[in-house]
């Protein structure tokens, strides 16, 4: 790239005034932190955090869900601004991670995860509502029935033909063994947050937010051609007796009532990426880190071919069913999906992967976190760590294979040509048996033309480069690939990105050089610019030609001289800008971590990042950083292009009949026989939007249907997209964390913030303390008192976020606080924690043993769900009707309770439970649950076990428990293990365990 100096933006004065306005009282959320911030970038991060969390700004719904956008009239991936996506949730986690880093308050991160689990991960999160009610009927030996994909929506519905038998799912058994069931712990990708479509949440009607879907009909189905439909379809809406299912698939009989969810793999991977950084920045709550591990365990379904066909076997048009992991491409595919039946005959379920892998969906940081012990999030299933180890290398190879001669990353690859396992075209380049595809998944517009699909994934590669360099791994092949890809990409992209200058283009968006010639690729182009103080410009689109060479390994890679890109259409997308700045920042920091100082390119990247951050701040309107967007595509609100098959008519959630009375005949050249409706025919409620009249007037006065041009300018909108704002906010934070903090920055160092409340665990003559580490702290001082509130006496100092106090007397309650220190000074004390050490009694051990586990890692919900297994270690049979289990807990508000046995190998009807209140409360217990067994449970032979017993308890008013201090609860026990804090009684005598 060619380097030119950056000018200081003239908007600094304006942005300083904006900063003063924000800090001086418009917002009330932790304004003291903004005032105390130690750098410009930290200040701006905290101000943007306040803007995002201020209820008056409208980023969140009444249920606390982040909207895709504050504004509602929009159509892109979501077709309405008050939808939300799994993408938005993953960005929310990232925001809260960096807020926790600055403030030491990690409760916001945990609240975000709880909200995600409640509203967009379709599991029973503790409210008793089963959102995957029939997943237990899934048969991993026959995951799903084949239906071909087609290029045009007009060619749908697709016949459920079973032409190709699905392969075997190799993950289901180990996931069941690890977690006790196969309820998929992944986000569904799309929510109708305000129930704007009107379908309602069938399986959890107390929620306003509703699981919905749109895209179902092939690569040419844009948002303008999609039909919104409920993910839980009992045929109330859609065609009578058929629901919406017959728009997408057809079979010999009417479709059954069903639920179905689709996961966007990039979003869940980003959530895991965020939790990795939380852990690196001092967060240590194993409950939520274990949830991230579990998500990563299930995310492996994104590595599998849609119908579990052997990878590469369809290159000749005849796929072979996979027998296990031979159906895994080890990349992040576009999606994975699962579903099942509803109602009394709904005893079936299915699961699919995806055959198409897009470079923009890969996440090497998540793969690192889930595979490397240093990453700290290796899932619990036996083969998960190895799968993610393979995936990490495979993803890095994928990027190397797809990098163009200039440096941009091409589209991706597929295991199913045209979505129907057709033979690969002659001469098609391959990658581990997958065929090169320049635009995987969708073609309207081509999926790899948007520059955001460059900035998103390469920012993650820049992170990995920094992580590996910081850990001293500068020689491995993984490091070499990460460095090569990000370095070449940064060098290419910086030629087309500008701060305080505006690039010169022609009428079609091509960059021009100083002679007025189009820049059509090549290395180190000299783009003509004009001075534009305070502006920023990044590319919007790319044009692709050629293909990579067939992959034969990193050592033989030739750099792809025949894969070329043309960079076009400079724009001002704030979200893309945020990701791009983070890519520059992590790359710059990585060069310093690798070599000890910034390389020449690293220094240029750091300076460009700073200039872009300063320029972007001038676009902050008090609600967020945003620019005016001309929407050339919004004529499509009025065109009729949503296909309905001939004779299909049904009810939409907004009360209208589909396809409506004004539909027009479809184009037979596209393969269908039906009609086309418009956006407003399908979603008439959009006409009530406050911006609709403006759009309609603009269309009537400016759109020329003959030339298909806006003769009086395209409609213009200003959007505050949640993900875009978070991308910008976190760009300020990461620059501050990696650049300012690393080199001292432009500000004076400050004393650290107070640690979070310590976790105090009492033992026999010992108390073990731990707390979240604090940014900038070099040591911690532990203080103790025997009276709550002090006065406290210093016990000692430690460089670690943990301390063991062995100078204690059993039976005495001790109160602890911790402060953090560095060369500048000492923080205030943490909140107080207490512990009472006690001698360890010896548990009873007879001829029965109790094993325990839980998959309930949320200790604050409204149910608890222990799972047990009784083992006969003696030499005589034991009748289970003579055995009782006692599980000790605190009720946290005395209310009537209900017992449920969800599953038992000995028969759920043979298991019953009663609740016994202790005469006097014990540590961690004021009640116990006593589980007993009927005669039908039979007896346990010597050496045998009872099989799994899954129980569930709730209060009748569904108020919450707090299990975190319950005597018998242990969130870390996710696999069956001996557990002495739940007891066994035989004929009334204690034969196993330790009572509180």
Tell me the role of every PLM-derived stretch:
Residues 858-867:
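Short, solvent-exposed loop/turn segments enriched in Ser/Thr/Gly
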């Amino acid at each position: 790239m060619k380097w030119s100096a950056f000018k200081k933006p003239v908007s600094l004065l304006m942005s300083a005034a904006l900063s003063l306005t924000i800090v001086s009282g418009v917002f009330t959320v932790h304004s003291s932190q903004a005032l105390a911030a130690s750098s410009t970038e930290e200040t701006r991060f905290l101000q943007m955090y306040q803007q995002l969390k201020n209820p008056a700004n409208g980023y969140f719904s009444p249920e606390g869900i982040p909207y895709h956008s504050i504004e509602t009239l929009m159509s892109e991936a979501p077709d309405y601004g008050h939808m939300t996506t799994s993408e938005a949730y993953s960005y929310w986690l990232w925001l809260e991670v960096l807020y926790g880093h600055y403030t030491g308050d990690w409760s916001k991160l945990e609240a975000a995860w709880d909200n995600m689990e409640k509203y967009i991960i379709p599991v029973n999160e503790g409210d008793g509502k089963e959102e995957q009610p029939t997943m237990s009927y899934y048969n991993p030996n026959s995951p799903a029935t084949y239906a071909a994909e087609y290029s045009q929506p007009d060619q749908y519905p697709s016949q459920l033909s079973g032409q190709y038998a699905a392969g075997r799912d190799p993950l289901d058994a180990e996931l069941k063994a690890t977690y006790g069931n196969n309820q998929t712990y992944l986000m569904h990708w799309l929510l109708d947050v305000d129930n704007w479509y009107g379908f309602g949440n069938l399986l959890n009607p107390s929620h306003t937010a509703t699981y919905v879907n749109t895209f179902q009909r092939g690569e040419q189905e844009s948002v303008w051609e999609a039909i919104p439909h409920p993910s839980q379809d009992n045929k109330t809406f859609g065609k009578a007796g058929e629901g919406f299912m017959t728009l997408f698939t057809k079979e010999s009989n009417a479709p059954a009532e069903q639920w179905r969810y689709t996961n966007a793999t990039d979003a869940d991977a980003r959530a895991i990426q965020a939790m990795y950084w939380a852990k690196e920045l001092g967060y240590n709550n194993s409950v939520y880190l274990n949830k991230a591990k579990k998500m990563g365990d299930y995310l492996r379904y994104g590595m599998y071919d849609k119908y579990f066909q052997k990878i590469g076997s369809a290159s000749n048009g005849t796929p072979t069913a996979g027998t296990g992991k031979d159906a895994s491409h080890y990349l992040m595919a576009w999606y994975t999906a699962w579903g099942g039946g509803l109602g009394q005959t709904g005893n079936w379920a299915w699961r699919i992967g995806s055959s198409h892998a897009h470079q923009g969906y890969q996440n090497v940081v998540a793969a690192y976190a889930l595979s490397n012990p240093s990453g700290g999030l290796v899932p619990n299933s036996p083969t998960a760590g190895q799968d993610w180890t393979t995936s990490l290398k495979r993803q890095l190879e994928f990027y190397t294979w797809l990098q163009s001669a200039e440096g941009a990353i091409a589209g991706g690859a597929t295991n199913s040509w045209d979505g129907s396992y057709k033979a690969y075209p002659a001469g098609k380049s391959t990658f581990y048996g997958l065929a090169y595809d320049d635009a995987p998944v969708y073609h309207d517009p081509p999926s790899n033309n948007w520059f955001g699909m460059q900035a998103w994934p390469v920012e993650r590669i820049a992170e990995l480069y920094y992580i590996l360099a910081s850990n001293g791994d500068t020689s491995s092949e993984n490091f070499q690939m990460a460095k090569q890809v990000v370095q070449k990409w940064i060098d290419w992209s910086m030629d087309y990105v500008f701060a305080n200058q505006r690039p010169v283009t022609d009428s079609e968006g091509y960059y021009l050089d100083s002679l007025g010639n189009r820049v059509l690729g090549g290395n180190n182009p000299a783009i003509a610019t004009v001075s534009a103080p305070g502006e920023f410009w990044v590319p919007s689109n790319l044009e692709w030609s050629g293909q990579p060479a067939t992959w034969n390994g990193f050592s033989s890679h030739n750099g792809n001289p025949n894969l070329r890109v043309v960079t076009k259409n400079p724009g001002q997308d704030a979200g893309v800008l945020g990701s791009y700045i983070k890519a520059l920042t992590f790359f710059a920091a990585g060069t310093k971590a690798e070599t000890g100082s910034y390389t020449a390119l690293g220094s240029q990247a750091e300076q460009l990042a700073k200039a872009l951050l300063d320029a972007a701040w001038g676009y902050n309107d008090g609600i967020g950083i945003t620019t005016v967007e001309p929407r050339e595509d919004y004529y499509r609100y009025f065109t009729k292009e949503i296909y309905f098959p001939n004779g299909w008519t049904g009810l939409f959630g907004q009360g209208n009949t589909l396809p409506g009375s004004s539909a027009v005949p479809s184009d037979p050249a596209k393969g269908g026989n039906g009609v086309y409706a418009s956006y407003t025919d399908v979603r008439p409620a959009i006409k009530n939007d406050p911006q609709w009249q403006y759009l309609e007037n603009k269309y009537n006065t400016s759109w020329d249907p003959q030339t298909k041009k806006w003769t009086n300018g395209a409609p213009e909108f200003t959007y505050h997209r949640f993900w875009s704002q978070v991308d910008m906010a976190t760009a300020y934070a990461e620059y501050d964390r990696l650049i300012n903090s690393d080199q001292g920055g432009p500000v004076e160092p400050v004393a650290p913030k107070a640690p979070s409340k310590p976790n105090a665990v009492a033992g026999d003559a010992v108390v073990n303390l731990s707390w979240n580490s604090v940014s900038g702290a070099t040591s911690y001082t532990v203080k103790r008192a025997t009276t709550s509130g002090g006065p406290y006496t210093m016990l000692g100092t430690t460089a670690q976020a943990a301390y063991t106090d062995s100078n204690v007397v059993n039976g005495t309650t001790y109160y602890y606080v911790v402060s953090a220190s560095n060369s500048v000074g000492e923080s205030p004390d943490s909140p107080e924690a207490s512990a009472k050490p006690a001698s360890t009694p010896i548990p009873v051990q007879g001829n029965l043993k109790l094993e325990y586990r839980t998959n309930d890692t949320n200790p604050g919900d409204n149910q608890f769900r222990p799972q047990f297994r009784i083992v006969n270690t003696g030499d005589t049979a034991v009748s289970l009707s003579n055995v009782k289990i006692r599980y000790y807990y605190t009720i946290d508000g005395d209310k009537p309770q209900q017992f449920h046995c969800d599953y038992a190998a000995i028969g759920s009807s043979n298991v019953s439970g009663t609740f016994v209140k202790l005469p006097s409360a014990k540590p961690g217990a004021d009640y116990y649950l006593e589980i007993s067994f009927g005669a039908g449970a039979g007896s346990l032979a010597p050496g045998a076990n009872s099989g799994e017993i899954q129980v569930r308890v709730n209060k009748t008013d569904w108020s919450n428990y707090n299990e975190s201090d319950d005597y018998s609860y242990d969130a870390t026990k996710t696999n069956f293990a001996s557990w002495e804090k739940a007891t066994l009684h035989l004929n009334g005598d204690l034969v196993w365990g330790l009572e509180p």
